[in-house]
Amino acid sequence: MGRMIRIELYRAFHGKELKTAMLLGGLLGLAHFVLEVIPSVSHIFDGYHPDIASSVVGNVTESWMGGMINAEINIYQMVVFLLITIPYAASYYTDRKSGILKNIAIRGEKSIYMVAKSIAVFITAGVSAVFPLLLNLMLTMTVLPVITYDWYQLPNYKAVFMKLAIKNVVVYSLVYMILIFVFAGLIAGLALSLSLYANNRFVVMSLPFLICVVSGRLVTYALSLIHISEPTRLLSIS
């Protein structure tokens, strides 16, 4: 088992697909740093007013790619479903086509191979998803100060882990990256399961993207209908 896992991880991390995904994601994180963060350094005190409790100087929390709504994070939220399937999610399909899987099945190691494959797909997907955010956060921390939230500055004090955000905003960001890592691995696992039946590599890599995007739109639409159908809104004359 351990030997097979090492082989699959070696194949995954030395493949050009993972490097391509990390390069594309890294360019997105770097683009935000160059276009958004660096220009904000010269205006670091513009939003600070000593008499206003909620005002703060320019800081990492509000400026890094995952801190506030910006063009780069919107792009990331769309392309991340492709970034996580590029590295290794379709490798079962390619192994089956190349005959590697047949050789493994003959040796009676297919179940071990599937476990090792799943672990490698999970880890590479998480790395691909988190790398742009981690790179951008580290770059932003080199030019802007880290300021911990207080209750006046919380974007949503009812959100998950807000107490942690007040104590240590960097740890708070890292916790969310861990969650992104896990969900990315699970979604890539969906692509791996599809490769058991699909006969096209493009389908294996793109179907999770389509499923996530379409389901996200449907949930948003459903929630909007629920919001519109609230009794207070139905009875409102405005």
Protein language model annotation of sequence segments:
Residues 1-26:
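Aromatic- and glycine-rich beta-strand/loop motifs that create alpha-glucan
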Residues 2-6, 111, 115, 170-174:
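Alpha-helical membrane-protein architecture signal
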Residues 16-18, 109-111, 115, 200-205:
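Membrane-helix interface segments
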Residues 21-26, 201-215:
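Central hydrophobic cores of alpha-helical transmembrane segments
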Residues 25-90, 118-188, 192, 196, ...:
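Secretory targeting signals
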Residues 89-124:
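Helix-loop-helix units of permease transmembrane domains in multi-pass membrane transporters
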Residues 192-193, 213, 217:
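Alpha-helical transmembrane segments of multipass membrane proteins
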Residues 226-238:
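Single conserved hydrophobic/aromatic residue that forms the stacking wall/gate
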